[in-house]
Structures are given as structure tokens and as C-alpha cells.
């Protein structure tokens, strides 16, 4: 139902993302059925906000020029009440990076935050103790309580990626048990997750459901790719193949999650 809708609608997903994984994000978006636009030129942001279904922001290789484009774009998408996904990469690592991410979080209508547990901990007011882009934080009951409080206070969905993924709203939490350890052996897996959230949010009004379906789809594609891969190189290629061949029946049959 959801993937079929994506392939029928072909939503335009505007990315302002990092230059390490921009190609992965574009190919993953195309594979699942969307049309990515990778545009960070500040003078274009208003025009793209009018034609695109969703905005995905990733601060992995942030600099002042790109940050200003993100602010401009987030302003226009927010004014149009269109979904905005933020991946605050390495939040908590440096003061300059934190300042940019916190401005995005505090000044604009971010719909979905996709990050690892350390980054989300920094978002919700816990000490994330981030180490680069690696996750060093364990999700526990206190973390989940604080995350739900944040989601309620800011009307946002939190997507916590890890060995177990969490989708957190003000009212409910989903735990996803699908996935592959191979996703940690390549660059871009987390960035592609944010892209998937953007794709699904571009066609699904309920952002909790959009985030849940996005992460299930990506995690299941990772499982399918691992089954036929010999290492990280073939896994990367097979992941794009798996996303392009994935359908709603695959997700229904293989989904392993619970709502708590």
C-alpha cells in the first residue's frame, strides 16, 4: 500500500545533505520510487519548496554556506506546512555544529528527527557523549520518557536508529527488530534512513506511520541485501537492488516490530 503509493505518486524529495553520501541518498530515493532533488543553492530554495513534497536536511558535512541554505529552505517549507526531516549528524561533537543544528531545531518546523541514540540524547537534553558519528548511548526507560516528553512538547517524531530502531511520538513508541549488521559496515546507511523518512513523509500524512514504514522498509531491504552479499561492497550494491525490488508484501511478511 505505502510503497505502491510512492511509486504511483513519485514524490519530489528535496535534499540538502552531505557530500560523503549524497549519491547513496539519491539512489536510495530513486530505488524506492521517489524523485530526489539535491539542491543547496540558496537562491533556489523558495522555488523548490513550492514543487517538492518534503525536505530532508543532513548536517554531516556542514559549513556556513550550506547552513544558510538550510535555514532559508526550512523557512519556506515550514511556511507551506510541508514535512521537514532533520538528520543532525554528530550533534554534540563541536560547538559550531551544535549551534547550527540547534538553530534548525529551535527556529523551524522540523517534523521528523532521524538520528542515532547519542544524537537524540543531545536533542532531548541528555548528555549524548557523541564520538564523531558513532553511537555511544544506550536507550533505556529514562531516555524513552524524555524522548516522549520532547516529542509532545515540540510536536515531532523522533526516529532513533540502532541495533533496535525506535519511532517515538508523544503517545506511542514503536520498536523495530529488523535490520542488518552490514549496514554499519558502509557509509551512508543512516543518511539513507533519513531519505526514506522523507520519501514516506512525502506521501503519508501521519508522520509516525511514515517513519515506521520508512524504517521497516529500509531495514528489511538491508536484510534482503545481506542474504546475497559477500562483503560490504556487494552489500552496498545489493541494498539499492533490494530497495528497487521491495514491495508492500515483502514488508508485511518480514516486518518485526511492536508498539509499546
Swiss-Prot record:
Q: Which InterPro entries match?
A: Hyethyz_kinase, Ribokinase-like
Instruction: Note whether rRNA-binding occurs among the keywords.
Output: no
- Its gene? thiM
EC number(s) for this protein? 2.7.1.50
- For this entry, the protein name equals Hydroxyethylthiazole kinase
Q: Which residues bind substrate?
A: 38, 188
The pathway entry for this protein reads as: Cofactor biosynthesis; thiamine diphosphate biosynthesis; 4-methyl-5-(2-phosphoethyl)-thiazole from 5-(2-hydroxyethyl)-4-methylthiazole: step 1/1
Positions in coiled-coil regions? none
- What keywords does the record list, in alphabetical order? ATP-binding, Kinase, Magnesium, Metal-binding, Nucleotide-binding, Thiamine biosynthesis, Transferase
Q: A Gene Ontology molecular-function term?
A: hydroxyethylthiazole kinase activity
EC supergroup of this enzyme: transferase
- A Pfam family assignment: HK
Entry binding sites for ATP: 114, 161
Query: Could you tell me the Gene Ontology terms of the biological process aspect for this record?
Result: thiamine biosynthetic process; thiamine diphosphate biosynthetic process
Amino acid at each position: 500500500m505505502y510503497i505502491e503509493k510512492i511509486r504511483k505518486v513519485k514524490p519530489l524529495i528535496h535534499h540538502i545533505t552531505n557530500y560523503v553520501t549524497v549519491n547513496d541518498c539519491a539512489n536510495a530515493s530513486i530505488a524506492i520510487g521517489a524523485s530526489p532533488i539535491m539542491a543547496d543553492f540558496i537562491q533556489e530554495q523558495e522555488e523548490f519548496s513550492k514543487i517538492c513534497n518534503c525536505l530532508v536536511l543532513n548536517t554531516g558535512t556542514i559549513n556556513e554556506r550550506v547552513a544558510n541554505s538550510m535555514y532559508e529552505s526550512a523557512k519556506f517549507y515550514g511556511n507551506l506546512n510541508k514535512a521537514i526531516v532533520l538528520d543532525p549528524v554528530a550533534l554534540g561533537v563541536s560547538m559550531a555544529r551544535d549551534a547550527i543544528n540547534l538553530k534548525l531545531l529551535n527556529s523551524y518546523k522540523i517534523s521528523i528527527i532521524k538520528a542515532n541514540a547519542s544524537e537524540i540524547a543531545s536533542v532531548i537534553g541528555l548528555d549524548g557523549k557523541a564520538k564523531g558519528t558513532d553511537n555511544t548511548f544506550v536507550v533505556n526507560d529514562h531516555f524513552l520518557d524524555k524522548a516522549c516528553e520532547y516529542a509532545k512538547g515540540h510536536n515531532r517524531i523522533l526516529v532513533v536508529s540502532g541495533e533496535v530502531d525506535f519511532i517515538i511520538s508523544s503517545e506511542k513508541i514503536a520498536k523495530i527488530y529488523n535490520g542488518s549488521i552490514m549496514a554499519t559496515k558502509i557509509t551512508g546507511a543512516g543518511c539513507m534512513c533519513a531519505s526514506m523518512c522523507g520519501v514516506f513523509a512525502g506521501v503519508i500524512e501521519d508522520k509516525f506511520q511514515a517513519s515506521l514504514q520508512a524504517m521497516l522498509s529500509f531495514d528489511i531491504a538491508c536484510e534482503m541485501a545481506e542474504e546475497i552479499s559477500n562483503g560490504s561492497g556487494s552489500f552496498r550494491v545489493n541494498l539499492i537492488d533490494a530497495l528497487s525490488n521491495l514491495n508492500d508484501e515483502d514488508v508485511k511478511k518480514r516486518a518485526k516490530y511492536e508498539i509499546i
